[in-house]
Structure formats: structure tokens, C-alpha cells
Amino acid sequence: LTYLNHRRHPPASSALLMEAHKIIVKFFVEDASRIRGEQFVAIFHSWIQQQAIPEHLLIDVVDYQHLSGGPGTVLVAHEANFSMDREEGRLGLMYVRKQPANGDFGDRLRQGFRACLQGCARLEADTQLRFKTNDCVVRLNDRLLAPNNPETYAAVEPHLRTVVDKLYPNSD
């Protein structure tokens, strides 16, 4: 057995944070009543057949809708997972990067937004869903490189601001 030290870990350095690649981006659906959850399985299978998301090797679909608060329907790719989940009671498309991506942290953040928005656009084309692009969640899923603390936020915020400013020019 290994002793677990529960003391507060020191904040990650900005240099380490900039190596983080496990980026999560989620955009929410405007009206979840426009689709039944079980429809995502067939939709995601068609994406696999067409390899519909650029720069992603789409592999499998897993349906976890029977789990309350679970990940919903998951499209597994080598590089990342896409899932239609109802986290916090809100249906949305979540992109969870698993593999490192090229470029600096800002490039990886842009890549996460781009991949998630490509998935949203594809779902809008394949269904009656519409996504709210003015409301999203961004997370870094790496407790070592990006602990959830004010220092991490301060290091990430300028990169996130750059991405958001390019996506939404002339907005505050």
C-alpha cells in the first residue's frame, strides 16, 4: 500500500500548465425536447461509417443513458471522446481530449473548440437540434498540470480570452 499525502499540493507552474492537453469543451443544446436520447447511437454510428470528424479516428459508440448523471451516449475516437450528456441537467455535446495534440496550449485550446463545434455543426445538420454557441463549459482534466485553483485560472484565462475573442469578435 502507498501512503496518500492529503496535504495541499503546490500550484502547478505556468510552464507545466502549458503542457496540459486533456481539454474539455461542452456546448449546450437550445431545446432538448427536439430529440430522443436513443437517437444519438444511430447518429454516432453513421459518423463512424463516414469518419465525419476531421483529424479524429472514430471507433465506437457506447450508450450510458441508463445511468442517471452518466455520460449519456459516447462516441469514442482515438484522440478524444464526444458525448451527448445531461450533466447539470443540461443536454449538450461534450468534447474530451485524451491524446496530446500539436502546438502550444493556445493551439490545443483552439483545437478543442474547433472539434466540439464541428460536432455541434454535424449534429445540427443531422437532427433538428440547435446549439447555444454563447454558452459553453471549458475544463482542464489534469489535476497535476492544471489543479483547480486561482493560479491555474490566471494562467489559462489569457489563452481562453484569445480563443473566445476570435470566435466572437466585437463581443464583451
Residues of each region from the PLM?
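Short, conserved charged micro-motifs
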Residues: 32-42, 103-107, 147-153
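Short glycine-rich, basic-tinged beta-strand/loop micro-motifs
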Residues: 20-25, 131-150
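Short, extreme N-terminal leader segments that mark the start of a protein/domain
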Residues: 3-6, 13-45
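Intrinsically disordered, low-complexity regulatory segments enriched in Ser/Thr/Pro
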Residues: 78-107
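Ampiphathic alpha-helical segments that act as solvent-exposed interaction surfaces
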Residues: 39-43, 47, 101-126
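N-terminal low-complexity, intrinsically disordered segments
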Residues: 28-84
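Short glycine-rich, low-complexity/disordered patches
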Residues: 53-67, 122-141, 168-172
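Short, hydrophobic/π-rich interface segment
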Residues: 144-170
